[in-house]
């Protein structure tokens, strides 16, 4: 009662067994987990148009609001943001196996990079400071791993131990977050360790590109923030 938007889980399921595909699959599963937890805690709401239901009246309200005017993509996210800010307790993100949808990961690194740049660029238009703070925190954490690695290579000794301990801690936290959700979603967490290393590099890279390279390619057209 009073629900105007229902967010369903969307998972990436790729063909083959590539490291890039495994990393995208785990990354997207992680985003779904964080988004589900955040919605239950009322921190922020996030979802994908690939598995989203909403009432007709709230959709027309959203169109009239021009909430995402002049933003190239992300109407699904901005619709959720608009509804959650206007109507209290109106967005639901249930943990339900019966409303899971599936999508394909990007086939190559260039396509993947452009997709993530597009997502990162639209985040600058979010009006909810909680979600901005969350993504900024994740980026800073991953940057700290790169800095720690550089210090370990240059100085050795204690820095190597600190880096190894921090990295081991990250792997443990990520594994115990993804493993139960992988079982719930009936998705394996293949190549977890390699994908987790890859994930650190990609998060840092995308963050820098979002700040300093504001252009991206989408549907064979080039856009700029």
Model-identified regions with their sequence ranges:
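Catalytic donor/gating beta->alpha subdomain of glycosyltransferases that bind UDP-sugars
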Residues: 3-32, 60, 66-131
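Short, P/G- and charge-enriched loop/turn segments at secondary-structure junctions
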Residues: 37-43
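Membrane-embedded multi-pass helical conduit in multi-pass membrane proteins
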Residues: 134, 138-215
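Short hydrophobic helices that act as membrane-entry/anchoring signals
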Residues: 21-36, 118, 122-125, 192-195, ...
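Conserved nucleotide-sugar donor-binding
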Residues: 46-63
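Short secondary-structure boundary/capping segments
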Residues: 43-44, 91-92, 208, 215
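Short linear elements at protein peripheries
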Residues: 48-50, 218-225
């Amino acid at each position: 009662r009073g629900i105007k938007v229902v967010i369903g889980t969307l998972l990436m399921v790729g063909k083959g067994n590539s490291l890039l595909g495994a990393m995208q699959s785990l990354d997207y599963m992680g985003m779904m987990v964080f988004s589900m937890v955040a919605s239950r805690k009322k921190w922020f709401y996030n979802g994908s148009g690939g598995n989203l239901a909403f009432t007709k009246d709230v959709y027309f309200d959203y169109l009239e609001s021009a909430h995402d005017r002049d933003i190239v993509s992300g109407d699904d996210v901005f619709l959720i943001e608009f509804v959650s800010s206007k109507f209290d307790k109106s967005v639901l993100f249930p943990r339900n196996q019966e409303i899971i949808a599936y999508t394909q990961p990007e086939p190559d690194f260039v396509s993947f990079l452009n997709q993530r740049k597009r997502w990162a660029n639209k985040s600058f238009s979010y009006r909810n400071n909680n979600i901005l703070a969350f993504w900024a925190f994740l980026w800073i954490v991953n940057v700290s791993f790169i800095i720690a690695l550089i210090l370990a290579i240059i100085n050795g000794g204690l820095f190597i131990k600190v880096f190894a301990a921090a990295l081991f801690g990250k792997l443990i936290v990520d594994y115990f977050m993804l493993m139960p959700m992988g079982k719930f979603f009936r998705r394996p967490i293949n190549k977890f360790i390699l994908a987790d290393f890859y994930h650190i590099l990609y998060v840092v890279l995308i963050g820098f590109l979002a700040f300093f390279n504001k252009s991206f390619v989408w549907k064979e057209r080039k856009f700029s923030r």
